Design a protein with these regions (language model features):
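ABC ATPase nucleotide-binding domains
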Residues: 231-254
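Conserved ABC transporter NBD signature motif
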Residues: 56-64
Length: 254
């Protein structure tokens, strides 16, 4: 389990995280929702070790994140940022093998390449192995970057807005794959903007507003329009489709 206690963070005088308390269950698919600028991406940077934790504590399995160094950190967290761009036409297999860099001092071993093939197979993209990365669609590129994370064999996969710029097919496909990975001994945590995708695929949902974690009142549904308005500043309506609840923004507020 990942535990975050009394976490605060600021860029200069601008407070971007305020007294964050969160617990992410192990081997589950969790999603963090909230408006732009509420602190979600900064939280991920702290969890991934890209920014130092100065005020508060992040623990994995009861051990402080600051105790994990180098290879141990790489074996703990795999991080997919919002933006990743490759301008050179590297082959997919060569992009994925870079995920083994923390574990190979020299050239990749046979075992490293076997990890690449297995990751591509797990994501059903083995047919892309020898394709130039720059020729792939946005959805295919996202899957390749997730394969790059899988070859690290991390315990936790962090994904910052993984469905951004994807069509409906790849959004659904990717969310299904992330849920499957959480059933294969990965703890998967994603930042997302679409609450309906999160409602349909995630095991656990967390909400942020104005740099803080917010929770619905006891016995209040997470799809409750009043609660969601407090998060997004938008009026919502609930709808039931095949026993699943979705929410629809009300355009009357515009």
């Amino acid at each position: 389990m990942i535990q975050i206690d009394q976490l605060n963070y600021a860029y200069g005088h601008k407070q971007v995280l305020k007294n964050i308390h969160l617990e992410f269950p192990e081997n589950q698919f969790s999603v963090i929702l909230g408006r732009n600028g509420c602190g979600k991406s900064t939280l991920f940077k702290l969890m991934a070790g890209l920014e130092p934790v100065k005020d508060g504590l992040i623990r994995y399995a009861g051990k402080s994140l600051s105790d994990f160094k180098g290879k141990d950190r790489a074996a703990l967290f795999g991080f997919l940022p919002q933006f990743h761009k490759t301008v050179f036409p590297f082959l997919v297999k060569d992009v994925v093998i870079t995920g083994r860099a923390a574990f190979s001092r020299y050239r990749p071993s046979k075992s490293d390449w076997e990890c690449v093939d297995q990751a591509l197979l797990d994501l059903d993209i083995e047919h892309l192995r020898d394709r130039p990365y720059t020729e792939l669609s946005g959805g295919e590129r996202q899957l390749v970057m997730i394969a790059r994370i899988l070859v690290q064999a991390p315990k936790v996969i962090l994904l910052d807005e993984p469905t951004n710029h994807l069509d409906v097919y790849y959004q659904s496909y990717l969310m299904k794959k992330l849920r499957q990975l959480s059933r294969q001994n990965f703890t998967v945590i994603a930042i997302m903007h679409d609450p309906n995708l999160a409602f349909l695929f995630a095991d656990h949902l967390f909400f942020m507003r104005q740099h803080e974690v917010v929770k619905p009142e006891s016995k209040t549904r997470i799809t409750d329009p009043k609660f969601l308005k407090s998060v997004y500043d938008v009026e919502f309506h609930e709808a039931m489709i095949q026993d699943k609840t979705i929410v629809i923004p009300d355009d009357s507020w515009l």
